[in-house]
Every structure is written in structure tokens, then in C-alpha cells.
């Protein structure tokens, strides 16, 4: 991967870390594409198209967990306290009572929105790369917890010749720990220029950049040569089962096919990390249960018929 110290795209991504190799630059067929996590986002690949999942970039179940924990806390403590001290709140100090109720309503609304967003977000928002049409097809879901607007599905279609890639980096410090996450971003430019018209997050929430480098190389190889010159990877399991969901955040002890695949790809560095994180099972298991609830409630992605056919078979359909 040829990285840069200065972005070539305008406007610059606020979280920009580095540009990746240009789409039309020379492809190194000897580059090793052996990251253990390279296949965790592979939905499908054949002679016509490659479909990349984006589920690994979203921590599903967290919104449901927040909603459940808040509901239990409110029912066991907040509402009983309001009832028991009704006279003090609304007779002796009515302004304090109004403030308490306003805060309670706001917290209830926020927790409900987190849980609702977790359950309404589609199970996947995939991106398809078609070699025949030389286009990419993006399944987006527009939803904002900060703005009250209609949550909706949006399909974006761009020419492959418009696509470049960059790495974004987000870091934060709590004073005791330093957290870093990287993201592979597809940069959509105006034809023949580096003027950005859109940015699409393809894979995020990665601690290191190695898998992101290899994923971009994998996509470029597929679009240039087809499946013959890319590693033979096994597509991820796309169903939702209770057991696999329960161990979703602890795949190293999962008795499912996903667990066996994860263990077969483990490297020596994974073992000390597992040793440090397994003691938080009291968080991972409830979060896995909430992951199951969110994914069962979530709608499956449904492409419009014409776009779905075009993105799979490679024959451009007439779209209104």
C-alpha cells in the first residue's frame, strides 16, 4: 500500500489519517492478503460482483442494553422516588418538581431513541462492487439521533472510476487509557478530479490498519482481475441464531461455526488479548443477548428490484 503524508482530496476529511493507493495505480499481485479478519465482512463474491458487509463496524445491541438498563433503573428507583416525594416536588418546591420531570422525560426519550435506532437499523448495509457495470452500489440507512428527521433507506450508485480510498483515524484519552480506531473510507470524486462529492465508510472500528489496507487491495484486485487473482475466502455466516449472538463478543469460546472459524485464524498475539478481555464476560454476555434482540428486530436489507438485479448480474437496468 502506498500511503501519503498529505491528502490529495478536497475537501479534506476532518479525521483523515492517510490516503491509500490510487485506484488505477499498479497492483502488486505478490502482496499478501492474509489478515485473519479479511473475510469477516465478505458476504458474496463471484465473477460478476463482490459484496462487502458493514456489520462489523457497528456495535449492535448497545442501544438495547442502554434502554433496558435505564428502564430497570427508572422503574426501581426514579419513578418510585417521584411518587413517594410527590408533595415535596410539586407543592413545596414546584420548580424542582418540574425540573425533575423534565430531566426524567429527556432521559426516557434518549434511552428509547438509542434502543429504537438499534432495532430499526437494517441487519446489514452492504456495498456491492460489480465488474461488468464497473459501478459500486451502496445500501445506506439515514438516521440521526441528534436531528429529528425521517429515518430511511437510500441507495447510492457510483462509477468505479470515481472511487478512491483513505484511512480515517479517531483517538480519545480518558487520562488512564488511550483509545484509537481506524476506518476505511471510500472517497467518491468528480470525474477526472480529486474534488470529493461523497464519502462512504466501508469498514471501521479497527484498532490497527492492516486489515483495512488489505481490504482495499482485495477490492482493487477483484475489479481488475476478478476472483481468479484474489484469495479464496469463505463468506461469513449471515443468519441470526441465539447461540452465535450470545457469544458474538466472545467468539473465541463460541461453540458455533463462527467460533470454530475464529479459533482457526487466531495468532499468538490474540491469546494475551483474550486473557485480558475474557474477565469482562459479565458485560459481553448481556451485550450478546441484546445483540440477538436487536438483530431479530432489525429488518433485512432489501434492494430495489431493478438495482438488485443490475448489481448482481451486471446488466444495467432502466431506473426511474
Task: Label every PLM stretch briefly.
Residues 1-41:
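Short, non-transmembrane cytosolic segments of multipass membrane proteins
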Residues 135-136, 147-172:
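Phosphoinositide-dependent membrane-docking surfaces
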Residues 185-223, 228-240:
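Canonical phosphoinositide-binding patch of PH/PH-like domains
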Residues 130-144:
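Membrane-cytosol interface motif
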Residues 52-124, 248-320:
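Alpha-helical transmembrane spans
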Residues 43-57, 182-184:
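Short, hydrophobic/proline-enriched secondary-structure or compact coil segments at domain edges
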Amino acid at each position: 500500500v502506498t500511503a501519503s503524508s498529505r491528502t490529495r482530496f478536497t475537501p479534506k476529511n476532518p479525521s483523515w489519517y492517510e490516503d491509500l493507493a490510487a485506484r488505477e495505480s499498479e497492483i502488486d499481485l505478490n502482496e499478501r492478503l492474509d489478515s485473519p479478519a479479511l473475510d469477516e465482512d465478505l458476504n458474496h463474491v463471484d465473477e460478476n460482483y463482490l459484496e462487502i458487509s458493514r456489520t462489523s463496524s457497528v456495535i449492535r445491541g448497545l442501544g438495547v442494553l442502554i434502554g433496558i438498563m435505564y428502564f430497570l433503573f427508572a422503574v426501581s428507583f426514579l419513578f418510585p422516588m417521584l411518587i413517594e416525594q410527590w408533595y415535596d416536588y410539586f407543592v413545596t418546591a414546584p420548580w424542582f418538581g418540574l425540573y425533575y420531570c423534565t430531566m426524567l422525560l429527556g432521559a426516557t426519550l434518549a434511552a428509547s431513541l438509542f434502543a429504537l435506532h438499534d432495532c430499526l437499523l437494517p441487519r446489514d448495509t452492504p456495498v456491492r462492487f460489480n465488474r461488468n457495470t464497473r459501478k459500486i452500489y451502496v445500501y445506506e440507512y439515514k438516521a440521526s439521533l441528534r436531528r429529528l428527521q425521517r429515518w430511511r433507506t437510500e441507495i447510492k450508485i457510483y462509477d468505479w472510476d470515481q472511487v478512491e480510498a483513505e484511512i480515517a483515524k479517531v483517538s480519545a484519552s480518558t487520562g488512564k487509557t488511550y483509545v484509537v480506531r481506524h476506518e476505511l473510507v471510500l472517497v467518491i470524486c468528480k470525474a477526472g478530479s480529486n474534488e470529493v462529492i461523497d464519502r462512504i465508510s466501508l469498514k471501521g472500528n479497527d484498532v490497527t490498519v492492516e486489515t483495512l489496507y488489505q481490504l482495499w487491495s482485495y477490492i482493487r484486485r477483484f475489479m481488475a482481475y476478478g476472483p481468479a487473482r484474489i484469495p479464496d475466502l469463505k463468506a461469513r455466516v449471515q443468519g441470526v441464531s441465539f447461540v452465535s449472538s450470545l457469544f458474538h463478543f466472545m467468539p473465541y469460546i463460541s461453540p458455533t461455526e463462527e467460533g470454530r472459524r475464529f479459533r482457526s485464524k487466531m495468532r499468538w498475539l490474540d491469546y494475551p488479548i483474550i486473557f485480558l478481555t475474557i474477565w469482562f464476560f459479565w458485560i459481553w454476555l448481556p451485550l450478546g443477548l441484546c445483540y440477538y434482540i436487536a438483530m431479530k428486530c432489525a429488518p433485512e436489507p432489501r434492494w430495489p428490484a431493478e438495482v438488485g438485479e443490475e448489481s448482481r448480474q451486471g446488466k444495467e437496468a432502466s431506473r426511474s
